[in-house]
Amino acid sequence: MAIKSYKPTSAGRRNMTTSDFAEITKTTPEKSLLAKKSKTGARNASGRMTVRHHAGGHKQAYRIVDFKRTKDDKTATVKAIEYDPNRTANIALLVYEDGIKSYILAPKGLKVGDKVQSGPDADIKPGNALPLSAIPEGTLIHNIELKPGKGGQLARSAGASAQILGRDGKYIIVRLTSGEVRLVLATNRATIGEVGNAEHSLINWGKAGRNRWRGKRPHVRGSVMNPNDHPHGGGEGKAPVGRPSPMSPWGKKTAGKKTRDKKKASTKFIVRGRKSK
């Protein structure tokens, strides 16, 4: 994928960039792998806003992606690389020997016509899914399970990957994109290679309207609100926060305060935190 820029015919176009979608080989999705996606406007069943700065956006159909990769000993052929509006990565349409179709995350280098497999005996090549115990040290992986059979949860966005560093009993030591090193059960599965479409992070959206198409609403600073709307609000002109620490709209400390539960069960699997030197 390459990044495409535009002539500055307007203020919104001046710095705008887009993907050239050169890797996309099919523009219409597989109907049997679509599901309805209803928008909530960031409101819950009571009608109350539960997430700020989210609402609207272009209508989308959800693509059913296979994150589990449990169809062992069956070879699948890559029929197409498709765009998925629900994620930053592209997806690959697979057709198995028995005619079953499925979507997977498209790893870097995967092309139409390539063969992919899953299972402990699969080759170590991009797109193949294996238990972590069957993957050599130093290999780049993505779509990593945290619980056996639950499906991949880690390293799924565009350009993401993790690396196997070693083994510790029934666990595999994995370094994630963030720099965090953690233990993952050896029976969990992962897919070989990096997630494709790595240049996605280089896109300049150019204008507010493109973010609205993505379902993002304006993010208003608390310092420009009234004091009844935000702890940072009020004052004459450009006033400071006026408190020992920056606050959330609900009066809780923010901007540096740790939010992870100290008693979270999975903390024991983190060998080194992402911010550790």
Swiss-Prot record:
SMART domains: Ribosomal_L2, Ribosomal_L2_C. Residues 212-277 are annotated as: Disordered. InterPro entries: NA-bd_OB-fold, Rib_uL2_dom2, Ribosomal_uL2, Ribosomal_uL2_bac/org-type, Ribosomal_uL2_C, Ribosomal_uL2_CS, Ribosomal_uL2_dom3, Ribosomal_uL2_RNA-bd_dom. Keywords: Ribonucleoprotein, Ribosomal protein, RNA-binding, rRNA-binding. GO terms for molecular function: rRNA binding; structural constituent of ribosome; transferase activity. Residues 254-277 have a biased composition (Basic residues). One of its GO terms (biological process) is cytoplasmic translation. PROSITE patterns: RIBOSOMAL_L2. It comes from the Bacteria. GO terms for cellular component: large ribosomal subunit. The keyword Ribosomal protein applies. The keyword Chloroplast does not apply. Belongs to the universal ribosomal protein uL2 family. One of the primary rRNA binding proteins. Required for association of the 30S and 50S subunits to form the 70S ribosome, for tRNA binding and peptide bond formation. It has been suggested to have peptidyltransferase activity; this is somewhat controversial. Makes several contacts with the 16S rRNA in the 70S ribosome. Part of the 50S ribosomal subunit. Forms a bridge to the 30S subunit in the 70S ribosome. This is Large ribosomal subunit protein uL2. It comes from Leuconostoc mesenteroides subsp. mesenteroides (strain ATCC 8293 / DSM 20343 / BCRC 11652 / CCM 1803 / JCM 6124 / NCDO 523 / NBRC 100496 / NCIMB 8023 / NCTC 12954 / NRRL B-1118 / 37Y).
